[in-house]
Amino acid sequence: MKIIYPEELKQKLIKKLNYFYILLGEDSILLSKAEQLIFYFAKDKKFIEKNTINIEKSTDWNKVINFHKSKNLFFKKTILIINFTIKKLNLSLVKNINKIPLFKNKDILTVIKLNALSSLIKKSTILKILILESEIIYCSTPYEWAFKKWLQYEIKTRNLKITQESFLLLHKYYEGNTLCLNQILDILSITWPNENIKIEKIKKIINQFSIFSPVNWINAIFNKNKKKAIYILDSFFKQKYNPLILIRTLQKDLLILLNMKREKKLNINFFLKKNNISLNRSKFFANALYYIDFNNFLKIIRILLQIEIKIKKEYNNSVWIQLKTLTLLLSSPMKYTP
């Protein structure tokens, strides 16, 4: 399976526009950017019309068949977007999907969004016929080297002049948060379009426009990145974010972590998939499983309960002090020895 990464897509489209594209992953920013690029180059080839078919159940595939049957003399060049919201594939649907290349037509450009099915496709050959005929674009949230390459590409695309120190700061605080970083880069390009952007300017923008999710906070904790975890928590405090959402999200992930610890033979990816956790987070759970002192779990659960009671009875800023204590406790590198 040959994968096209987001930073490679534009050059691929310049060379050749294919008739089949598979968008593999669930990152909303990467999906949106990939679609926009495909649409832009398709428009140049006179693909003006768009038709979206959502596959929510296996019988919805009939809509795809009917679309192809409806082609007539007055048919205009169309981009067909097949959007899978279904969570599982049955044999009948697999057979039908693999037949898509048989419908190959110079007037139809097909974009397949696999969404939640992406992890299944990466590890299986069930759609091998479709994969052989398609360009596969990787749209999962990038981390580490992949995030670095994507960030470099986005900076270059906007013609931003950013110092190495500034680049490293953006990478440090926004790794895995494409939504927030995309917005920050847009702000930088509007604010300082032709200037050399030094770290002081980056810090100023970061302090003014910080958009994080509870998952970003938990990932930083599980990755032993105390400084980043506290920074994200402070951002939530400034935004007057509902701390109960943070508590519930953390409780859920800690429970999953505890159940992972109890497994005698653990397949992390399978376990996370079963619990509806993105496989992109597997490294964070693996890290936490390795270093968190599970003897502290009772203490952690006790603090969580205290915070929840305080939120419901007499909410005040001391809740955030307790959340900070909890963050430091969880992100301390205490290797667990079984």
Curated annotation (Swiss-Prot):
Q: Which reaction does it catalyse?
A: DNA(n) + a 2'-deoxyribonucleoside 5'-triphosphate = DNA(n+1) + diphosphate
Which superkingdom heads the taxonomic lineage of this protein's source? Bacteria
GO MF term list: DNA binding; DNA-directed DNA polymerase activity
| Protein's UniProt keywords contain Nucleotidyltransferase | yes
What the entry lists under Gene3D superfamilies is as follows:
1.10.8.60, 1.20.272.10, P-loop containing nucleotide triphosphate hydrolases
Query: Which GO terms of type biological process are on file?
Result: DNA-templated DNA replication
Q: Which UniProt keywords apply?
A: DNA replication, DNA-directed DNA polymerase, Nucleotidyltransferase, Transferase
Q: Does the keyword Phosphoprotein apply?
A: no
What's the top EC group for this one? transferase
GO CC terms on record? Answer: DNA polymerase III complex
E.C. numbers? 2.7.7.7
Q: Which PANTHER family match?
A: DNA POLYMERASE III SUBUNIT DELTA (PTHR34388:SF1)
Q: Which family does it belong to?
A: Belongs to the DNA polymerase HolA subunit family.
Subunit record text: DNA polymerase III contains a core (composed of alpha, epsilon and theta chains) that associates with a tau subunit. This core dimerizes to form the POLIII' complex. PolIII' associates with the gamma complex (composed of gamma, delta, delta', psi and chi chains) and with the beta chain to form the complete DNA polymerase III complex.
What this chain does, per the entry, is described as: DNA polymerase III is a complex, multichain enzyme responsible for most of the replicative synthesis in bacteria. This DNA polymerase also exhibits 3' to 5' exonuclease activity. The delta subunit seems to interact with the gamma subunit to transfer the beta subunit on the DNA.
Official protein name in the record: DNA polymerase III subunit delta
Q: What is the lineage of its organism?
A: Bacteria, Pseudomonadati, Pseudomonadota, Gammaproteobacteria, Enterobacterales
